[in-house]
A protein has these predicted regions:
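Polar, enzyme-active/binding microenvironments
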Residues: 9, 222-229
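A structural signal for short, well-ordered beta-strand segments and their strand-loop junctions
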Residues: 15-18, 66-72, 128-131, 143-144, ...
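Noncatalytic linker/hinge segments flanking ATPase motor cores
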Residues: 23-31, 56-63, 109-114, 181-192, ...
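Conserved beta-sheet core of the metallophosphoesterase superfamily
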Residues: 140-224
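Flexible, charged surface loops at secondary-structure boundaries
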Residues: 7-11, 61-64, 119-123, 136-139, ...
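Core catalytic region of metal-dependent phosphoesterases/phosphodiesterases
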Residues: 1-109
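Active-site-proximal loop/helix segment associated with metal-binding centers of metalloenzymes
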Residues: 85-142
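A generic local structural motif
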Residues: 2-3, 56-57, 129-136, 153-158
Length: 229
């Protein structure tokens, strides 16, 4: 994994992660597509239990770092699924136990910041799980916002964020971009998924914040970073 190689090379004081949960198994955008649901049922990718396990196992590689996980829109997929789904009428029954367990957590207010942060903190108590209204500033850069939500609940964009009175780095757009003091990282996913049809600006890319406050994109081309060669 080239991202982990980069982290080991830099040994940063902080590691900021976005969208650690995809929500593919219960994606609300696909719940009414019978053909996608048929495929998921056949290949087993509609198992929420398995997807949660993959997420938690993936975070194992970061446990020795000072990790902060930004609340992201894909995290919301799970809470939205719990609110809007009647488990008795769901496309599959395999997620019924998770539905019951996670709903109980919400009912007794055990997971006020959402199910994904609750599960992460349960296994990795040293990792910080940031809420939507939290702030985390590193060397002058705000890094606690995902970028999907802007001022006063509006839709976020770099054009809007560049007007803030602080510099900011977000992670929602999957494409590296810079507009004055507003930066967006790229993605660590596959560059082609179901929903990014047509010409794409997606790129594997991270942002590093230097000790002097300068922020720099590190792009991965053909699966490798070349900045330090």
């Amino acid at each position: 994994n080239e991202t982990l190689k980069l982290i080991k090379k830099l040994n940063p004081e902080n590691v900021i992660l976005h969208d650690v949960f995809d929500g593919f198994s219960i994606n609300h955008h696909e719940l009414n597509d019978p053909f996608i649901q048929f495929k998921k049922e056949n290949d087993g990718t509609n198992s929420l239990k398995d997807e949660i396990e993959v997420m938690l196992n993936g975070l194992e590689a970061f446990k020795d770092y000072n990790v902060s996980i930004v609340r992201s829109n894909h995290d919301d997929f799970l809470d939205r699924w719990l609110k809007n789904t009647d488990w008795r009428k769901a496309n599959t029954m395999k997620n019924s136990i998770e539905y019951m367990e996670y709903s109980w957590l919400l009912l007794k207010n055990a997971a006020p910041n959402g199910i994904i942060p609750f599960l992460i903190r349960g296994k990795y108590p040293k990792m910080k799980t940031l809420n939507r209204n939290d702030s985390l500033i590193i060397n002058g850069w705000e890094v606690a916002q995902h970028g999907d939500i802007g001022s006063n609940g509006s839709r976020g964009s770099l054009l809007q964020f560049r007007k803030l009175n602080t510099k900011i780095i977000v992670g929602h757009y999957h494409s590296p971009e810079r507009k004055d003091g507003a930066l967006s990282v790229g993605t660590s996913t596959k560059l082609r998924v179901n929903y990014n049809q047509g010409p794409s600006s997606w790129l594997h890319s991270h942002v590093i914040i230097h000790t002097d406050g300068k922020a720099q994109h590190i792009n991965f081309l053909n699966g490798h970073f070349t900045t330090f060669k």
